[in-house]
A protein has these predicted regions:
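Absolute protein N-terminus
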Residues: 1-2, 96
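Non-catalytic surface loops within mature trypsin-like serine protease
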Residues: 11-13, 60, 94-96
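An amphipathic, aromatic/His-enriched active-site/gating alpha helix that lines ligand/cofactor pockets
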Residues: 25-39, 57-91
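Short, surface-exposed ligand-recognition loops at beta-strand->loop->(often short) alpha-helix junctions
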Residues: 10-23
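Solvent-exposed beta-strand sheet faces enriched in polar/charged residues
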Residues: 44, 91-93
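Short, well-ordered beta-strand segments in beta-rich or mixed alpha/beta enzyme
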Residues: 3-10, 39-68
Length: 96
């Protein structure tokens, strides 16, 4: 059964736009879509123009965590840290 992942990123307004731009380039979701277990990803920008939400669907929590590890090892936090305006949060949900 698939797992739903919701990630919340509190960012500066410019940081949110940088993240959205990054997601659309060759280093963004193009790579995400190639990972084992990937099913879907959608990006939402809150009304404050600073909080980015990701809605993701993966085959399993383990597949998503392996993907996150890959991203961290390849410099994602170096990109995110100067743009974040607080701690980001990842929550896992099961479909009932």
């Amino acid at each position: 059964m698939s797992v739903i992942v919701v990630a919340e990123f509190p960012m500066t307004e410019q940081g949110a736009q940088d993240f959205i731009d990054w997601s659309k380039n060759a280093d963004g979701y193009v790579i995400t879509r190639q990972h084992k277990g990937f099913e879907d990803i959608r990006t939402f920008l809150a009304e404050d123009k600073k909080t980015v939400y990701l809605y993701e669907k993966w085959d399993s929590k383990e597949d998503h965590q392996a993907y996150l590890s890959f991203r961290v090892e390849n410099g994602l936090m170096d990109f995110l840290n100067p743009r974040l305006d607080g701690d980001f949060k990842v929550t896992y949900f099961s479909e009932e």
